[in-house]
């Protein structure tokens, strides 16, 4: 059976995928900042494809999975904040509003290339300055698109979501389904 190679250094993607499969983590060397499309969904897919193809050359007999998550508000991409001030600004922008979390994915297995994107709508509650300052102090905003992590302390910021929760964390469940369809067996947990 082919090995599953995750082309990511994201601990969240590793955690989600390793719940279902035995995986090998091997981050790609793609410079994501150089890939920009007008449409955020196309950007996420293109970055995921670049990551997957980067590793497909190194691991041609295995199954490669790559993903990229982008947060958008009114069509504007909110990347990973560079510092606490930028994180604070992002959280204030998101306060009381609905934004989209887009995860582009690409799976390469032999001659099969599966690509797509999942979009989840996330509505933030009205955030007080005190709540924003508290969240900034947790440091959880670091290395997170949009400046928050829904799976941790950031859950308190969210009023509700429409769609796949795991997509907001970083890897939509559809990727797991596609791997099963490709013949990969779920790992035994008992």
Curated annotation (Swiss-Prot):
The active site is at 68 (proton acceptor). It is found in: Cytoplasm. Its EC number is 3.6.1.9. Keywords: Cytoplasm, Hydrolase, Nucleotide metabolism. Transmembrane segments: none annotated. GO terms for cellular component: cytoplasm. The record marks 12, 69, 151 as: Important for substrate specificity. It catalyses: dTTP + H2O = dTMP + diphosphate + H(+); UTP + H2O = UMP + diphosphate + H(+). Its cofactor is a divalent metal cation. The keyword RNA-binding does not apply. InterPro entries: ITPase-like_fam, Maf-like. It comes from the Archaea. One of its GO terms (molecular function) is UTP diphosphatase activity. Pfam families: Maf. It is an enzyme of class 3 (hydrolase). GO terms for biological process: nucleotide metabolic process. Nucleoside triphosphate pyrophosphatase that hydrolyzes dTTP and UTP. May have a dual role in cell division arrest and in preventing the incorporation of modified nucleotides into cellular nucleic acids. Belongs to the Maf family. YhdE subfamily. PANTHER family: BIFUNCTIONAL DTTP/UTP PYROPHOSPHATASE/METHYLTRANSFERASE PROTEIN-RELATED, BIFUNCTIONAL DTTP_UTP PYROPHOSPHATASE_METHYLTRANSFERASE PROTEIN-RELATED. This is dTTP/UTP pyrophosphatase. The lineage of its organism: Archaea, Methanobacteriati, Methanobacteriota, Thermococci, Thermococcales.
């Amino acid at each position: 059976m082919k090995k599953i190679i995750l082309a990511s250094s994201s601990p969240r993607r590793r955690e989600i995928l390793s719940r279902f499969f035995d995986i090998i983590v091997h981050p790609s060397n793609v410079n994501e900042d150089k890939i920009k499309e007008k449409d955020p969904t196309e950007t996420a897919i293109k970055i995921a494809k670049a990551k997957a193809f980067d590793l497909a050359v190194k691991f041609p007999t295995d199954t490669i999975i790559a993903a990229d998550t982008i947060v958008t508000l009114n069509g504007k991409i909110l990347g990973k904040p560079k510092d606490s001030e930028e994180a604070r600004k992002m959280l204030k922008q998101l306060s009381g509003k609905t934004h989209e979390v887009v995860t582009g994915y690409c799976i390469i297995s032999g001659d099969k290339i599966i690509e797509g994107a999942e979009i989840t709508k996330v509505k933030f509650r009205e955030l007080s300055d005190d709540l924003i300052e508290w969240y900034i102090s947790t440091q959880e905003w670091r290395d997170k698109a949009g400046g928050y992590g829904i799976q941790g302390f950031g859950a308190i910021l969210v009023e509700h979501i429409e769609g796949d929760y795991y997509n907001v964390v970083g890897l939509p469940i559809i990727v797991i389904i596609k791997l099963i369809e490709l013949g990969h067996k779920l790992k035994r947990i008992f």
